[in-house]
């Protein structure tokens, strides 16, 4: 992962939710150049603040008052918090459904005008891998998790239309150090490209509510980003450098969801507790 740098004027204070998660730990490092103070939040334990340029604040996204305190004094929000895997709906409800409402309502109350929402490819996961779609294609969530991210996109759209709060909703593909399987050869998003995309999402003016697919410059992709062209996002990495390693893995069955659906195994998760 390359060292982050920017020629942009830093914000005074950015808020990153989900800072204890896998991507949150990465962004804690790569977002440093973009703000004088990075406020980090999660319900889980986080490493202590480093110096004067970090603030660490534990927060349950389901707690409206706590979220309102969290958002006070920030210039923009990068909302990566919440349940990040498929779980029973009741577990997703608090953090992902109530939580995103609390984030936007706190943004409205405190005058925050830019949100970066970590949406997901699981918003469109029931499309087949032989289909090419764009941000205007009807959503086809593949899971309760995907439903919660679809709801978050609707929340972003509503708060722009009603209150003028701008959002870039990033439908993140698979952001890991390297692709872990054949599906991820198409969905992989490098950490460096994620940071490049976040920079464009933070600084591009007049985004309204823009939906962009978070994916690197992979050889085979299923997602057309033309409706997010104003962001001028130009990924530099590609999954092809991992092709030989991934191709050496055993070939899944043709009807394996990971080989059929854009959302992969999520389409077959749950219902939980129902035999």
Curated annotation (Swiss-Prot):
The active site is at residue 145. It catalyses: beta-D-galacturonate + NAD(+) = D-galactaro-1,5-lactone + NADH + H(+); beta-D-glucuronate + NAD(+) = D-glucaro-1,5-lactone + NADH + H(+). Homohexamer. Belongs to the NAD(P)-dependent epimerase/dehydratase family. One of its GO terms (molecular function) is nucleotide binding. Signal peptide: none annotated. It holds the Pfam family Epimerase. Pathway: Carbohydrate acid metabolism; D-galacturonate degradation via prokaryotic oxidative pathway. Activity increases with increasing temperatures between 4 and 42 degrees Celsius. Activity is below 20% of the maximum after exposure at 37 degrees Celsius for 30 minutes. Transmembrane segments: none annotated. Substrate binds at residues 84, 120-122, 174, 183. Optimum pH is 8. InterPro entries: Epimerase_deHydtase, NAD(P)-bd_dom_sf. It is an enzyme of class 1 (oxidoreductase). This is Uronate dehydrogenase. Gene3D superfamilies: NAD(P)-binding Rossmann-like Domain. The gene is udh. The keyword NAD applies. Catalyzes the oxidation of beta-D-galacturonate and beta-D-glucuronate to galactarate and D-glucarate, respectively. Cannot use NADP(+) instead of NAD(+) as cosubstrate. NAD(+) binds at residues 22-23, 42-44, 60-61, 80-84, 149, 175. Its EC number is 1.1.1.203.
């Amino acid at each position: 992962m390359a060292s982050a740098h920017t020629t942009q004027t830093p914000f005074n204070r950015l808020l990153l939710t989900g800072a204890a998660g896998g991507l949150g730990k990465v962004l804690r490092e790569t977002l440093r150049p973009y703000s004088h103070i990075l406020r980090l939040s999660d319900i889980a334990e986080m490493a202590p603040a480093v110096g004067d340029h970090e603030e660490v604040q534990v927060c349950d996204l389901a707690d409206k008052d706590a979220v309102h305190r969290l958002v006070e004094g920030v210039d923009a929000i990068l909302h990566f918090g919440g349940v990040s895997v498929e779980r029973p709906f009741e577990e997703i409800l608090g953090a992902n459904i109530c939580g995103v409402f609390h984030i936007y309502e706190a943004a409205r109350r405190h005058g925050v005008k830019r949100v970066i929402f970590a949406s997901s490819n699981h918003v469109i996961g029931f499309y087949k891998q032989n289909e090419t779609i764009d941000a205007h294609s009807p959503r086809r969530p593949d899971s309760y998790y995907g439903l919660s991210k679809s709801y978050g996109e609707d929340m972003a759209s509503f708060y722009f239309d009603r209150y003028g709060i701008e959002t870039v909703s990033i439908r993140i593909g698979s952001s890991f150090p390297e692709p872990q399987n054949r599906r991820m050869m198409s969905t992989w998003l490098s950490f460096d490209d994620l940071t490049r995309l976040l920079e464009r999402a933070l600084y591009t003016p007049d985004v309204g509510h823009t939906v962009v697919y978070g994916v690197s410059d992979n050889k085979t992709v299923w997602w057309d980003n033309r409706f997010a062209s104003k962001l001028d996002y130009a990924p530099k990495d590609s999954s092809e450098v991992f092709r030989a390693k991934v191709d050496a893995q055993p070939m899944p069955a043709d009807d394996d969801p990971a080989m059929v659906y854009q959302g992969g195994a999520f389409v077959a998760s749950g219902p939980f507790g129902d035999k």
